[in-house]
From Swiss-Prot:
This is Penicillin-binding protein activator LpoB. PROSITE patterns: PROKAR_LIPOPROTEIN. Residues 1-20 form the signal peptide. Disulfide bonds: none annotated. It comes from the Bacteria. A lipid is attached at residue 21 (S-diacylglycerol cysteine). Its main location: membrane. A lipid is attached at residue 21 (N-palmitoyl cysteine). Residues 30-61 have a biased composition (Pro residues). One of its GO terms (molecular function) is enzyme regulator activity. It is a lipid-anchor. Interacts with PBP1b.
Amino acid sequence: MSWIRIRRSGVLLLALVLSGCINQQQQPQPAAPVEPVTPPVNVPQPPKAEPGQNVPPPPKMQPLNWSATVSPLVGQMLKADGINAGNVLLVDNVKNSTNGSLQSAKATAALLNSLENNGQFSLVTPQQLAAARQTLGLSADDSLVSRSKAIGLARYVGAQYVLYSNAEGDIKSPSLQLQLMLVQTGEIIWSGSGAVVH
């Protein structure tokens, strides 16, 4: 029994020694304030223009003769088979698919002038077209002109035909493509193209 008492005493002594080793919890030290360091920002200074140094002018738009370009094409179109006289025609804005800036509004105006008093079609007026574009949420200068949008616009204004036009190629020598489409089916009933006259 003495070994048991010694063993128990040893365990108790060990427990007392270990319990005396527990340190008091230390209070956390306040953190030292850290000041953020902002890296220096190097702003590049624009080069100063010296007096007398000229800025090059933007490239000039080449004058294009839209009337001379569209007249022969419109003449061919009016002689095409399958056109019923007296129907309403919507002339959509000329789409610019060239590699530069093109005065497509002048091209559209030349198409409208060439089709006035043609004897085949009644034209949708620019006012009707502008109102329809606004109602359908299309801007007047919609650069995403597509055949489906043109047909949808023609249906909205009650036209039976739509003239879709696209200027394409190099801006120095563009070509104009015209397509007369039947609104009801979307069928292209006439197509023609020609070089734009300078």
